[in-house]
């Protein structure tokens, strides 16, 4: 059980960063005595709960990045339950994946740290660990991460621009690979040619101008055929 407020944790993080140190949780809560914990709870403070990571080195063969070795000492003990007793993604996804026997997990490489903690959780509940693959994040041409709050890359915007659904699907499947955007494949061909080994480990850039150019060429070819 941990009792630090969000402001207290934020201050600790800022101090560590200012000192040039990684913002790792200092495990203050581990030094609390049982009597102190009881006193804090009786005073009305509600704890959040962290999973204490041991000194074990976690490693896995990532389907995109290859072998990843992760030292638990380099990350904070993850919060698994909030102070309102609501479980967080780190633990709920593990329980759900184990229960439904998920075999493969693909997500962005900003989840690599989560994966290290979740592999530990899979081991703790004696569940089969799925295969993991972490895609590089897609960025805008300016190098910024894509935001759900921005309309620049929304499906709504592409629909208004009359972008073909097939063009957009082709672009999203081929971005970050060595496959040409110029060839617009049907869904069966896309499915047949999909290979996880084609994806780059490096960040990729989403250029709306490419979509517009490819779509224009695709629509012209359709007009010629008809």
Question: Could you say what each language-model-derived stretch is?
Answer:
Residues 5-148, 154-158, 179:
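Active-site cores that bind ATP or allylic diphosphates and position pyrophosphate for catalysis
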Residues 113, 125-226:
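Catalytic adenosine-cofactor/nucleotide-binding cores of aminoacyl-tRNA synthetases and other
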């Amino acid at each position: 059980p941990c009792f630090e407020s969000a402001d207290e944790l934020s201050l600790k993080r800022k101090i560590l960063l200012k000192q040039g140190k990684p913002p790792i949780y200092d495990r203050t809560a581990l030094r609390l005595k049982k009597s102190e914990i009881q006193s804090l709870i009786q005073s009305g403070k509600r704890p959040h709960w962290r999973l204490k990571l041991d000194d074990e080195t976690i490693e896995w063969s990532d389907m995109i990045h290859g072998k990843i070795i992760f030292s638990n000492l380099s990350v904070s003990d993850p919060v698994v339950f909030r102070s309102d007793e609501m479980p967080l993604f780190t633990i709920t996804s593990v329980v759900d994946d184990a229960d439904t026997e998920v075999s493969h997990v693909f997500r962005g490489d900003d989840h690599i740290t989560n994966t290290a903690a979740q592999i530990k959780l899979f081991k703790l509940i004696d569940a089969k660990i799925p295969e993991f693959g972490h895609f590089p994040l897609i960025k805008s041409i300016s190098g910024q991460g894509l935001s759900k709050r921005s309309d620049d890359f929304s499906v709504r915007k592409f629909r208004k621009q009359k972008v073909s659904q097939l063009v957009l699907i082709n672009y999203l499947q081929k971005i970050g690979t060595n496959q040409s955007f110029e060839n617009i494949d049907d869904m069966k061909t896309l499915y047949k040619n999909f290979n996880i080994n084609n994806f780059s480990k490096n960040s990729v850039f989403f250029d709306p101008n490419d979509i517009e150019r490819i779509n224009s060429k695709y629509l012209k070819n359709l007009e010629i055929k008809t």
